[in-house]
UniProtKB/Swiss-Prot annotation:
Residue numbers carrying Phosphoserine: 647
Statement: the UniProt record of this protein carries the keyword rRNA-binding: no
One GO BP annotation of this record: cell tip growth
Subcellular location: Cell membrane
GO cellular component, one term: plasma membrane
Membrane topology (Extracellular): 32-54, 165-177, 227-253, 308-327, 400-407, 457-463
Topology feature Cytoplasmic, residues: 1-10, 76-143, 199-205, 275-286, 349-378, 429-435, 485-775
Organ and tissue specificity: Detected at very low levels in roots, stems, leaves and flowers of mature plants.
Protein name in UniProt: Potassium transporter 3
Protein family membership: Belongs to the HAK/KUP transporter (TC 2.A.72.3) family.
Length: 775
């Protein structure tokens, strides 16, 4: 009984919190739906039946798409609790070979969160349809492009939502005051600038206000709706019957169909409900929507319909005109607050989708900021923040009329919903293992409805929808070009990797001079020796005594448990002292800015050495072989092989180095000193600990010797070697490929964050190796 009560309390708490982050965009739609619906030819059909028909369309659109499609079906297609367009794609990539990146390993499937509980789909034989997609590269490319189009629509919505939300919330000032429309636009721009400028500070100090603001807003609009129903037309409840939809199209004809571009605005923000699923639970979101959001919105739209059925002249400003005069200013203030909350949630969703896109190799490297005091999962991306702000201001100033912004907004939201509708049948068939008949029925029912709305929205392209096409094409081009270039570069690395025979033929010394220290060679290859290593030895025939090839890769799951992130293996015989470390992360994982990476790496390698000597064959050992890589996961004994103590020698050495540089008068050395002092705190933290093998008896003396070599190498010096590539298309490539690789992809590589910054590598420990790539 106590557990059941605790579960209920948890659901209620999450449902309460979801109002501030999930339902903001959907809840402010009443500000502009009727205004945009009765635009164009429909203004000439000002009858009660037309008003009732518009409300009936709104009611059934919310019911069929928001309530049934999303609450019943789409929310069930979560990826370990995460939602969004990339969650669906990741699910498909795990249950079928749909990914175009060839760096997936069998060991990835052994992650505890890779498959859901009770998931038996991996043991089922592949269907003919599934095998057809897996074998056909064009089908997989088409699926990826579909996902990237959906991703681009999310970013476009991130541009348009703040513009239409803030502008619509203060539109009432034009009708109620003598302010000019240009003045109202400037007020909206000022609010938008303030919203984006404060993004870098996070929302942890004000996030507790979001839910109360949205709940109060929903109660206000529901109360206003009830007031208008009782005051103006109590018989409006009859419009709940779909019969009025028939009457609507019978009386309005083509004008009624064109007005669907305004009707569809009633479900804008529904996709955000699914995208923000990871912050809450499907049960809590369903509870909040069905018990509060849905009835409040229906009452508000019904109330506006009752008011408009007796006041046709109020159509251009239907929402604020339906508010009683004594409550106008309080409602205006609440509308502005609700618009800011809704905009904040969409901006956060934009950061999140860009992070996921980058993690899965579909977006250029950008700075991702997460501070410990922020809400779990909250991130900030400076480049995206300023680009979205500039685009939002440009849309607000250029369009001025919120109806034109709304038409662009509606096209983006409906296209995103349409993409989800096309992905869901694949989920039903491949992930849920339901009969293909259910997939066909799903896409026929919901796809037909949404196709009608999309067709109506496309007609609005000259009246504002063109901005959606322009932005979505721009972002789709960027994401696909980056994915294409990254995939070609990976395949080039894979083709040019050094054969193991040539490494083994060099002997333990590798034919070079070995110096004390540890060299970490970063590569995208999950197997084999990268050409970067050979290129380095060719130009400088000396290297560190311990070599570790580090591969940071993203697995198509939201989060990888910390104890399962490091996969350690050996390259060549033990005397070579060459290891491989594969660091796996989920597409929602945020890299910590901590300085314990070197310590974790040394501990992991030491664990691998000991487990290898013990012939450990328990459940923690992955017996799969990736080339010459034996993948071993951390055991329960992890961290017990080495002891750690504070190194006074390194601290003293740092002080001596600083004194030497300070006394120098060389401008070059003084400049180097400035960079060194900037990195000194981080470097000191990385070097302040020394490792020593535990006082245990080793069955094999070679194990103790190898552990001492590992520890001494770490204490001596750790250097990070990263390839610095120059990418060009092959001379015999077609013109389009040369344009994409030599111009677009090269431009993105030169103007995005460097790998060293993304990997949190200290600048003074970084060595870049130049490489030429001909794709």
């Amino acid at each position: 009984m106590a557990d059941r009560r605790n579960r209920c309390n948890q659901i209620l708490l999450l449902a309460y919190q979801s109002f501030g982050l999930v339902f903001g965009d959907l809840s402010i739609s009443p500000l502009y739906v009727y205004k945009c619906t009765f635009y164009g030819g429909l203004r000439h059909h000002q009858t009660e039946d037309t008003i009732f028909g518009a409300f009936s369309l709104i009611f059934w659109t919310i019911t069929l798409l928001s309530l049934i499609k999303y609450m019943v079906f789409v929310l069930s297609a979560d990826d370990n609790g995460e939602g969004g367009i990339f969650a669906l794609y990741a699910l498909l990539c795990r249950h079928a070979r749909f990914s175009l990146l060839p760096n997936q390993q069998a060991a990835d499937e052994e992650i505890s969160t890779y498959y859901g509980p009770g998931d038996a789909s991996r043991n089922l034989p592949s269907s003919a349809f599934k095998s057809l997609i897996e074998r056909n590269k064009r089908s997989k490319t088409a699926l990826l492009v579909l996902v990237l189009v959906g991703t681009s629509m999310v970013i476009t919505i991130g541009v348009l939502t703040p513009a239409i939300s803030v502008s619509s919330s203060i539109d009432g000032l034009v009708a109620k005051t003598s302010l000019k429309h240009s003045t109202v636009v400037m007020i909206a721009c000022a609010l938008l600038v303030g919203l984006f400028v404060l993004q870098h500070r996070g929302t942890n100090k004000v996030a507790f206000l979001f839910a109360p603001i949205m709940i109060l807003w929903l109660l206000i609009i529901a109360t206003a709706g009830v007031y208008n129903i009782v005051t103006w037309n109590p018989s409006v409840y009859k419009a709940l019957s779909p019969y009025y939809i028939y009457v609507f199209f019978r009386d309005t004809g083509i004008d009624g169909w064109l007005s669907l571009g305004g009707i569809l605005l009633c479900i804008t923000g529904t996709e955000a409900i699914f995208a923000e699923l990871g912050q809450f639970t499907a049960t809590s979101i369903r509870f909040a929507f069905c018990c509060v959001v849905y009835p409040c919105l229906v009452l508000q739209y019904m109330g506006q319909a009752a008011f408009l059925s007796k006041n046709f002249s109020a159509l251009p400003s239907s929402f604020y005109s339906s508010i009683p005069d004594p409550f106008f200013w309080p409602v205006l203030m609440m509308a502005m607050l609700a618009a800011m909350v809704a905009s904040q949630a969409v901006i956060f969703a934009t950061f999140s989708i860009v992070k996921q896109c980058y993690a899965l190799g579909c977006f250029p490297r950008v700075k991702i900021v997460h501070k410990p005091r922020w809400v779990l999962g909250q991130i900030y991306i400076p480049e995206i923040n300023w680009v979205v702000m500039i685009l939002t201001l440009a849309v607000t100033i250029c369009f001025r009329d919120t109806r034109h912004i709304a038409f662009a907004f509606g096209l983006a939201c409906m296209t995103l919903a349409f993409v989800t509708t096309w992905l869901m049948p694949l989920i039903i068939n491949f992930v849920w293992n339901r009969n293909i008949v259910f997939s066909v029925l799903f896409i026929l029912f919901f796809g037909t409805i949404e196709l009608i709305f999309v067709a109506s929205a496309l007609v609005k392209i000259p009246k504002g929808g063109w901005i959606t096409l322009l932005l979505s094409l721009f972002f789709t081009f960027i994401t696909y070009v980056w994915h294409y270039g990254s995939r070609k570069k990976y395949l080039c690395d894979q083709h040019n990797k050094v054969p193991m025979k040539s490494i083994l033929s060099l002997g333990p010394s590798l034919g070079i001079i070995k110096v004390p220290g540890m060299g970490l060679i970063y590569t995208e290859l999950a197997s084999g020796v990268p050409a970067t290593f050979k290129h380095f030895l060719t130009n400088l025939p000396a290297f560190y005594q311990v070599v570790v090839f580090v591969c940071c890769k993203t697995v198509p799951i939201p989060y990888v448990p910390q104890k399962e992130r490091y996969l350690i293996g050996r390259i060549g015989p033990k005397t070579y002292r060459m290891y491989r470390c594969i660091i796996r992360a989920g597409y929602k994982d945020v890299n910590k800015d901590g300085d314990d990476f070197e310590d974790e790496l040394v501990m992991s390698i030491a664990e691998f050495i000991q487990l290898e000597s013990e012939g450990y064959g328990g459940s923690n050992t992955d017996r799969s072989i990736d080339g010459r890589l034996a993948v071993v996961k951390a055991s329960n004994k992890f961290g017990t092989r080495l002891s750690r103590s504070i190194s006074e020698a390194n601290i003293a050495g740092s002080s001596r180095s600083q004194t030497t540089v300070t006394n120098s008068k060389s401008p070059a050395l003084l400049k180097l000193r400035a960079e060194y002092e900037q990195e000194l705190p981080r470097l000191s933290m990385r070097r302040m600990f020394q490792f020593r093998p535990m006082d245990t008896k080793f069955r094999q003396p070679q194990v103790k010797e190898e552990l001492f070599d590992l520890v001494n190498a770490k204490d001596a010096e750790v250097a990070y070697i990263v390839g610095h590539g120059h990418v060009k298309a092959k001379r015999n490539s077609v013109f389009v490929k040369q344009l994409v690789v030599n111009v677009a992809y090269s431009f993105l590589r030169k103007n995005c964050r460097s790998p060293g910054v993304m990997l949190n590598i200290p600048h003074i420990c970084l060595i870049k190796v130049g490489m030429n790539y001909y794709l």
